């Protein structure tokens, strides 16, 4: 038996429990999400890695990033984007694309890169973002344990291949890894028929699900009605995610469909989505309220660092709807670790 440590930045803690050391460099990176595509191609500064040196269009938005600052491993579960990081990203980004100065910012968020540590690089900029696959049997004398870390989202299939090949070698399995040649579900090269009366919502689904969008198409009027108007997410797409994609909460639904990721940041679609989640997964009313509270709390968390202008107005209206009208407050959050984010008090 082989245990694979693929816990990202938390991999150092997992390794510690196994009695080995994987020295991680927790490098926090913050990003800004703008309300529409300011261009249709990636813009990257040709310079040594620095703050705000890449702008990436994706779906209906634009992502500007990133920063790089070392943070304590204890803080990675409760990251917050600071005002200074927002100002740095915006000032540097405007030099890259001047129109960003007048483009609405929807939210800010941060993540932590699972870099292998180096003592002589306090910022983490010079540390390789390459894949690190550790065989702890040859490295530490611990059989049946490997760590796969480093890398980036774009290289995750290569990471899977390296880890799988090492596992197969240890288990004496000689079959080749096929992840580099077998398309992911939805990426198959086949023609997809577009319904004549659903052009916009179907194109949105096609971008999210590829050839699987055919499985979501429906002639049912209710299934074709919109749950999320910003991202053109239909009832049928939500049903498909709940029935076929291992979705158990609104936040997991967001990752599958982009519900709540548009301009209103869940203000108008959260309750619609919650209704379907509750009905199809048979959640109790208490669980549903907690689900809504946790989802809206995370939306507010991303809006807080950029709460000015239209984004502040949107956040205020969301607060009035969910706290004043619906009566949702901190007591409704799903876990005691959650903290209510009231943008009006920031």
Question: Positions of the model-derived regions?
Answer:
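C-terminal catalytic lobe of FAD-dependent flavoproteins
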Residues: 2, 13-16, 21-30, 34-63, ...
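Glycine-rich, N-terminal phosphate-binding loop of Rossmann-like dinucleotide-binding domains
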Residues: 7-8
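Intrinsic disorder at enzyme termini
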Residues: 178, 183, 188-226, 275-346
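Detector for the c-type heme attachment site
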Residues: 269
């Amino acid at each position: 038996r082989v245990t694979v440590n693929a816990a990202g930045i938390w991999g150092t803690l997992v390794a510690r429990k196994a009695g080995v050391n994987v020295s991680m460099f927790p490098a926090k990176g913050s990003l800004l999400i703008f309300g529409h595509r300011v261009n249709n191609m990636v813009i990257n500064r040709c310079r040594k890695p620095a703050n705000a040196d890449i702008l990436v269009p994706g779906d209906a938005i634009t992502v500007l990033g990133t920063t790089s600052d070392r943070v304590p491993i204890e803080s990675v579960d409760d990251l917050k984007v600071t005002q200074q990081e927002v100002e740095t990203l915006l000032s540097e980004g405007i030099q890259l694309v001047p129109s960003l100065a007048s483009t609405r910012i929807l939210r800010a968020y941060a993540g932590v890169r699972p870099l292998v540590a180096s003592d002589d690089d306090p910022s983490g900029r010079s540390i390789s973002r390459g894949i690190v696959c550790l065989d702890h049997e040859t490295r530490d004398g611990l059989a049946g344990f490997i760590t796969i870390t480093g890398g980036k989202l774009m290289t995750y299939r290569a990471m899977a291949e390296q880890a799988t090949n090492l596992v197969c070698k240890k288990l004496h399995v000689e079959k080749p890894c096929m992840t580099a040649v077998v398309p992911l579900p939805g990426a198959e090269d086949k023609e997809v028929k577009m319904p004549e009366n659903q052009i916009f919502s179907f194109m949105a689904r096609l971008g999210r699900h590829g050839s699987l969008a055919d499985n979501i198409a429906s002639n049912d009027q209710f299934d074709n009605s919109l749950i999320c108007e910003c991202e053109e997410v239909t009832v049928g797409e939500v049903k498909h995610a709940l029935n076929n994609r291992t979705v158990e909460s609104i936040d997991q639904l967001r990752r599958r469909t982009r519900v709540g990721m548009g301009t209103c940041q869940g203000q108008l679609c959260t309750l619609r989505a919650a209704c379907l989640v509750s009905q199809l997964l048979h959640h109790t009313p208490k669980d549903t309220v907690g689900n809504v509270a946790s989802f809206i709390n995370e939306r507010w968390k991303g809006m807080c660092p950029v709460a000015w202008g239209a984004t502040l107005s949107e956040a205020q209206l969301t607060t009035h709807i969910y706290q004043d009208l619906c009566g949702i407050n901190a007591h409704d959050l799903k876990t005691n670790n959650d903290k209510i984010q009231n943008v009006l008090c920031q």
